[in-house]
Each structure stands twice: as C-alpha cells, then as structure tokens.
Swiss-Prot record:
Record flagged with keyword Iron: no
Domain of life: Bacteria
Organism: Anaeromyxobacter dehalogenans (strain 2CP-C)
Protein localization: Cytoplasm
Family label: Belongs to the CheB family.
Gene name, Swiss-Prot/TrEMBL: cheB2
Entry's EC annotation: 3.1.1.61, 3.5.1.44
Keyword tags: Chemotaxis, Cytoplasm, Hydrolase, Phosphoprotein
Protein known as: Protein-glutamate methylesterase/protein-glutamine glutaminase 2
Length: 341
C-alpha cells in the first residue's frame, strides 16, 4: 500500500484542461489502494488555489491550458505552497517542457497515447507519484550554506568532466551549465535519469539555457571542449579516448543509462585528468563510480543537501568517502572553472 504518512493515502491533485483526461487520470491514479485524487483543476490558477487550500502530497500538471497555463501554475505553487509536481506532456521532445522543471517541478512524464496499455501506464505513473510524495520540496535552488571541505591539492588540470543526476537534476544541470563560459576548455558528459524519450528535449532545453554546445550523445561523437553530451534513453554512455561510446550492456543498479559506467570509464581513460560531479537524486547510482574517480586521483564534487531536491546519490558518495567537496549547486561552476584552468 502507498501511504503518505501513517495510514493516510497519497493525495493527488490533477490539473489538465481536458475533462476527459482528468477523468482518465483520476481513474488510473485511484486504481491502487493507497492513492486518492484530492481534486481536479482545469488551469494553472485553479491548481495553485487548490494546492494552497487542500495541501495535496503531489500535483500532476499539464502545461498547455487556456487562461492560466501550467507554467504559471507551477510558479505559483512553488512560491505559495511548495509541493512535488509531476509534469505530464504530450510531446517529450519539446524543449519548452523543461521550462517547467526550471520553475520547480520535479519530474516529467509523457501522457499516454490512444493505444497505450493503461494498466502499464497506471503502474508507471503511480510509481512516480509514490516517489515524489516522499520528497521535501525546496522553494529555490539557493539555500542554506553547508560546510564545504577544503579542496584537495591539484596535481593535474582537468580535461574532462562527468556529471550524474536523477530527481531534480534538470534544474540543477541548468544551474551548473549556465555558470560555464562558451569557451569552457573541457568536454562534459552527463547521465540524467529521466523517462524514456525525453533526453533529446532535455538536451535542447539545456542548449537554450546555457552558452555551451549541448546535444544528445551519439556513438562515436568526439569529445570537444565546450560540448556537453547527454546520455540517450535506454543506453549507457561511456568514454573512450577522445570519443563517446554508447552501450547496450545490462542495466546497472536498475538504470540504463547509469551514472556508474560513465564515471568508471572516465576514470579508466583519464585518471586524475577527470572530474566527477554528483548532483541531486535518489538512490546510490554513481556513488561507487565517483569513488573510482577519486581513487584514480581525479577531483570529485557533490551538490549539497540544502540545494538538492533529494540528497540521496550525493549522500551515498559522501558516506563512501568518495567526495572531495560538497557545494551548493551555484558554486559548482566556479569550482569547475578553477579545475580546468
């Protein structure tokens, strides 16, 4: 049973301008004990008002609604009653959908097609809602400052940066990449846990948000200074000498792409010339890989708890002794600029 606390079910607010879809989603959500649809809303303003009045555990939000769209609804909810928000979109390749994540929504999922198996889709969306209902939402990325460990003595200039992120990652990635100059002297490779089909849209949005060359990785892509390669859905991203490689190897820690293969391949190829970064996310993916980078002599960074949507992956790495410095997300770009000089 999926409970938000004690014996209370997870209460979901559904926001969508289509009455038909609202009814369908309400049935799908409530099909399993432990979930309850607290209310439905037809636009962003109504969703914000209901969130303030009803205090649901999680909100599902359509983006394109008349009068007040999903973007304004998300902005109001995050300002007035911060609540975990799952964005539902009909177009996973649309970069504009990721604007919702920059406003504070935590996750994004494609709406079911007309031919979708609603039983399977129901299991998927309920698993996301269950996950999000347990997240303590922050109003802004900038938060209380956590103590930072002193930077280790640097023996070599960093020539490649690898980054791993999960829940809340798109917003954190945007904050990091926005802080880097267009002539950043190292390539960057990223694994972001996200629903299948969304990585191309994520790359497009990050390209708009930053001054870097951000693209979805292809097998054999050269690693170039100022280029950011995002692992595509369903394939591991690993680094060869000067090139990106995609792999269909089995999932690692249930993930494909997984952060750990990226980090371990970077450590193997670049050793102390590689910097590993773990951002916000749930679970342990990437923690062991970050320790491999540290053991190879490369510097390692982690996003702090105050600015993380979920301090899980980074916490696991800290507990392993794999992290040199724990930083607020808006201080990570400066650290990367210093390490690549």
């Amino acid at each position: 049973m999926s409970l938000a606390g004690g014996d209370r079910p997870i209460r979901v607010l559904v926001a969508d301008d289509s009455e038909l879809f609202r009814e369908l989603l309400a049935r799908v959500v409530a099909a399993e004990p432990g979930f309850e649809v607290a209310a439905v809303a037809a636009d962003g303003d109504a969703a914000a008002a209901m969130a303030r009045a009803l205090r649901p555990d999680v909100v599902t939000m359509d983006l394109h609604m008349p009068d007040a769209d999903g973007y304004s609804g998300i902005a109001r909810i995050m300002a007035e009653t911060p609540t975990p928000i799952l964005v539902l979109t009909a177009n996973p390749t649309e970069a504009a959908g990721f604007r919702a994540l920059s406003l504070g929504a935590l996750d994004i999922l494609e709406k079911p097609s007309a031919t979708a198996d609603l039983g399977e889709y129901g299991r998927l969306i309920r698993s996301r809602l269950r996950l999000l209902a347990g997240v303590k939402v922050i109003r802004h990325l900038r938060g209380l400052r956590e103590r930072r460990d002193a930077a280790p003595a640097r023996a070599a200039r960093v020539e490649v940066v690898v980054i791993g992120a999960s829940l809340g990652g798109p917003r954190a990635l945007a904050a990091v990449l926005r802080g880097l100059p267009p002539d950043f002297p190292a390539p960057i490779a990223v694994v972001q846990h996200i629903a299948d089909g969304f990585t191309a849209g994520l790359a497009g949005w990050l390209a708009q948000e930053s001054r870097l060359d951000v693209r979805e990785a292809r097998h054999g892509d050269p690693l170039r200074a100022g280029r950011v390669l995002i692992a595509p859905s369903g394939r591991h991203l690993v680094l060869g000498e000067g090139v990106a490689r995609l792999s269909d190897a089995p999932p690692v820690d249930t993930f494909r792409p997984s952060v750990t293969p990226l980090f371990t391949s970077a450590a193997r190829q670049y050793g102390r010339r590689c910097c590993g970064v773990l951002l916000t996310g749930m679970g342990r993916d990437g923690a062991e890989g970050l320790r491999v980078i540290k053991d190879a002599g490369g510097p390692t960074l982690a996003q702090d708890e105050a600015t993380s949507a979920v301090f899980g992956m980074a916490r696991a790495a800290v507990e392993l002794g794999a992290v040199d410095r724990v930083l607020p997300v808006d201080e990570i770009p400066r650290a990367l600029r210093e390490l690549t000089r």
